[in-house]
Amino acid sequence: LGPLPTPAVSFLTKSLRADLGIMISASHNPYEDNGIKFFDKDGLKIDTKIEEEISKEIRNKSPLVVPSDLGKASRINDVLGRYTEFAKITIPSNLSLGGIRIVADCANGAAYKILPQILRELGAEVVSIGVAPDGFNINKECGSTKPEKAQKAVLENSADIGICLDGDADRVLFIDEQGKLANGDIVIGLLAEAWVNKNSLNKNTVVATVMSNLALEL
């Protein structure tokens, strides 16, 4: 598929009716690091037990399969276009970002094209940073682990909001108009409240990690 955000691989695994999705990524780490993520046919993270079995096989240094037994690889064109359209239709059709100025920090990573493009197509004025990947500068002094540059850009450009992704675009930080980082639990709470007011929060339930503040339960 080529360089893609991790969520795009999740979506495309199901969309293309594949049996398995594989993402090569070190997430928010520097370029020297690397890792691998697996998705099942529904685009969901595979079961932990299966991950452990795969790790065991790798540690045991299983014999390599000869190339002739592997089949062949082919590239599918315009997968980014497919994911772009999917991402856009998750936004209500009556919602426009017109008149909103957004700083988008893409961490010199996989979303360096797609995030600014989607925001502009939704009507926003976009100030892009971290959009010049060279294979070595991913997550370097930018993105969700180093939001200071984006915070400064929000103030310098009188932006309404800042969005910081990590290298593979599966985590996000928000910056308010004053250049301050938005607390993730508060963001979840605000979204939940908005959906409750529209009677669109399924079962009036929010799913959060164990790291989230218990105040969300109130």
Predicted regions and their residues:
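Gly/Ser/Thr-enriched, mixed-charge loops and adjacent short helices
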Residues: 34-157
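Proline/glycine-rich low-complexity loops and linkers
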Residues: 52-85, 89, 178-218
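Active-site flanking residues adjacent to catalytic metal/cofactor-binding acidic residues
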Residues: 24, 104-107, 165-167, 208
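N-terminal small/polar loop signature for handling phosphorylated ligands or for N-terminal nucleophile
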Residues: 1-33, 117-175
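Short, well-ordered alpha-helical microsegments
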Residues: 6-10, 111-112, 214-217
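Hydrophobic "anchor" residues on beta-strands that sit immediately upstream
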Residues: 101, 162, 205
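Short Gly/Thr/Asp-enriched flexible loops that form oxyanion-binding sites at enzyme active sites
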Residues: 32-41, 114-116, 170-190, 216-217
